[in-house]
Swiss-Prot record:
Belongs to the bacterial ribosomal protein bL12 family. It comes from the Bacteria. It holds the Pfam family Ribosomal_L12. This is Large ribosomal subunit protein bL12. GO terms for cellular component: cytosolic large ribosomal subunit. It comes from Allorhizobium ampelinum (strain ATCC BAA-846 / DSM 112012 / S4). The gene is rplL. The keyword Ribosomal protein applies. GO terms for molecular function: mRNA binding; structural constituent of ribosome.
C-alpha cells in the first residue's frame, strides 16, 4: 500500500509534458494505444444521446393565429398572463413561443386550448 501511495504522489508531481511523455512510454512498453478508450467512450456517448432524445420539457409555438384571432388572443392572455397589447403582439408576430419549458402533458393541454380557439400550434 505504501508503494501505491508513493506512486500516486510521484505522478501527482509531474508536469503536463512529463505526464504526456509517460503516457507515450507506457503505450510503447505495454503495446497499447490511448485511442482505443476514446473510441469506446464515443460509442458509449451515442447510447447516452438516445436517452437524451426523450425530452421532458417542451415549447408551445404559435405558428398561425387563424381566422379567429380575437379568440386566440384571449386564450394567449389566459395562458401567459400577458396584457392585451403584449398578447396581441405575440399572436400577430407568429411563429412565436407561447410558453417554454413545460411538461409534455401541459404542452398537450395548451396546444388543445389554442387549437380550439382557432390557432395552429406546434410543440417542440
Amino acid at each position: 500500500m505504501a508503494d501505491l501511495a508513493k506512486i500516486v504522489e510521484d505522478l501527482s508531481s509531474l508536469t503536463v509534458l512529463e505526464a504526456a511523455e509517460l503516457s507515450k512510454l507506457l503505450e510503447e512498453k505495454w503495446g497499447v494505444s490511448a485511442a482505443a478508450p476514446v473510441a469506446v467512450a464515443a460509442a458509449g456517448g451515442g447510447a447516452a444521446a438516445v436517452v437524451e432524445e426523450e425530452k421532458t420539457e417542451f415549447d408551445v409555438i404559435l405558428t398561425d393565429a387563424g381566422a379567429n384571432k380575437i379568440n386566440v388572443i384571449k386564450e394567449v392572455r389566459a395562458i401567459t398572463g400577458l396584457g392585451l397589447k403584449e398578447a396581441k403582439d405575440l399572436v400577430e408576430g407568429a411563429p412565436k413561443a407561447v410558453k417554454e419549458a413545460v411538461s409534455k402533458a401541459e404542452a398537450a393541454d395548451l396546444k388543445k386550448k389554442l387549437e380550439d380557439a382557432g390557432a395552429k400550434v406546434d410543440v417542440k
